[in-house]
Amino acid sequence: MPKYTLPTRDALLKAMQVGETSIEAAEYMATRFEQILTKAKLLPECNDMLEKIKEYAQFVKFKLLSSAQVWSGQERPTSDYQNTQENKAEFLASHLEGLPSGLKLEVAIGDDAKILRGFSSNGKMVEGDQLKTMDGLLEGWLAKNSLAISGGAVVKIDNTGNQTKVDPQEIRQLINDSEKGVAKYFADKGVGMEVAQRTYQEPKALETKREEIRQEIESGAEAPTTQSIR
């Protein structure tokens, strides 16, 4: 019975480079690698590497989403900030025709309260007016919790429009709160939204992450051979 070698280190590294070009390429890379391991019945032995590849693909996806979807929020340091944003959210919620299914928000809060976010629908980037709608609703959620975006970071805002720093851990916990969280707010507006928090990464983190996985790959042994899995 013919034998085939699973992807070599060089092949995996090249696949990672290709996977950085688009969300679809990143997801395909991870999915294809898992399929190969499954068919070869080598999933248990290579599961650690698979998890690394999946982590990298997810990281690339979030980076591409957050960099392509420039935050569209407007700073409104006024006394009626909450009312303005809530009215805007209500208006957007009443005009949801044609909204795609499988919506997902991936969000990361840095230790300095910097925020990155990306919206997708069934793995594809949300764009145009639909992105504006999603951002508008997210701004409504922030305002409802006396929060706003200033200089790319989340800040507290009071009734007079004064801004103060906020504990990033409080924001992270609030995002996932069952009663006050983002998913609940979107659901109340009639929008099903999966919410996933990611680790905040600085702009050069992709290169760092790539180097970490490259070292993991190069420090390991070549994958064993197995029967044909084509």
Swiss-Prot record:
Subcellular localization(s) per the UniProt record: Cytoplasm
Start-end of Basic and acidic residues biased regions: 204-217
GO biological process: one example: protein transport
Keywords for this protein: Cytoplasm, Protein transport, Transport, Virulence
One Pfam family here: DotY
InterPro entries xrefs: DotY (IPR056465), DotY_N (IPR049927)
Cysteines engaged in disulfide bonds, as pairs: none
Annotated stretches, region: Disordered: 202-230
Job of this protein: Component of the Dot/Icm type IVB secretion system (T4BSS), which is used to inject bacterial effector proteins into eukaryotic host cells. Part of a subcomplex which recruits effector proteins and delivers them to the core transmembrane subcomplex. DotY and DotZ play a role in effector translocation, but are not essential and do not influence the stability of the subcomplex main components. The DotY/DotZ main function is to optimize secretion by modulating the delivery trajectory of the IcmSW module and the localization of the machinery to the poles.
Subunit structure: The T4BSS is a complex nanomachine composed of several subcomplexes. This subunit is part of the Type IV Coupling Complex (T4CC), a subcomplex composed of the DotLMNYZ core and the IcmSW-LvgA adapter subunits, linked by the C-terminal tail of DotL. Six DotLMNYZ hetero-pentameric units may assemble into a hexameric nanomachine, forming an inner membrane channel for effectors to pass through. Interacts exclusively with DotZ. DotY and DotZ are co-dependent for the assembly into the T4CC.
Name of the featured protein: Type 4 apparatus protein DotY
Organism: Legionella pneumophila subsp. pneumophila (strain Philadelphia 1 / ATCC 33152 / DSM 7513)
